[in-house]
């Protein structure tokens, strides 16, 4: 696979160019795994005035080379709209200068999701995620973790009811800093609105946080709300409104988001 992307994170601008070679296989009916070798060139530019030093330290060009491993066990009855089953996955990434890159880090993430069928064609989804990324010091340079590898907790795919990344570390000026670790719990009570139209409703409660270091501490952040899900001919569509249950000063009390092409 080859890729090229450009993203405006408001505080800085990111351009990525690279490629990967992936080898994958099924070990059984439910278990699959893969290993990827990758190389990417990253350029951070155009920092916002007053951007934190953490961001300013990474402005310029970087190269990441390394590998990624993943292992997944999936027993869900219908992955696009499950009623029952488990999905458990683990992933590990290593960026190393021994393969020619400038970045030096390791990252691992665990993700467990359980679906339980309930009466009247409803179901309960409970999901837990934990991840850590840590910079290494192979050549004594003590390089920071690339911004693109940090966790940004907050938004429709992590903590609904929060603006993207705002359930994790932010600066005194409310600028996203990214997290070195994350712990997230999502509880979803899903009910069918129209089986023919493949339209579902969802009452959710999210509980989690992103952390500046690799240790997890309480209290976590919390949000609750409503979501609509439609398995459309163009792919899954989701629209969610979440309420921040304990907003800090300057935070929004509610956030509406919409996404297409990804299930949760």
Task: Please tell me what each predicted stretch does.
Residues 1-3, 68-118, 199-201, 226-230:
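Surface-exposed extracellular loop regions of Gram-negative outer-membrane beta-barrel proteins
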Residues 1-82, 86-89, 160-161, 165-180, ...:
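Gram-negative/organellar outer-membrane beta-barrel architecture
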Residues 1-4, 35-41, 86-94, 110, ...:
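Transmembrane beta-barrel strands of outer-membrane/channel proteins
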Residues 7, 42-43, 97-99, 132-138, ...:
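Flexible loop/turn segments at secondary-structure boundaries
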Residues 17-25, 67-73, 107-116, 148-153, ...:
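Feature captures outer-membrane beta-barrel proteins of Gram-negative bacteria and organelles
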Residues 24-30, 76, 117-121, 192-196, ...:
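Outer-membrane beta-barrel channels and translocator barrels
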Residues 120-204, 210-212:
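Extracytoplasmic gating/loop element in the C-terminal half of outer-membrane beta-barrel translocons
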Residues 205-217, 234, 264:
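C-terminal beta-signal and adjacent terminal beta-strands/loops
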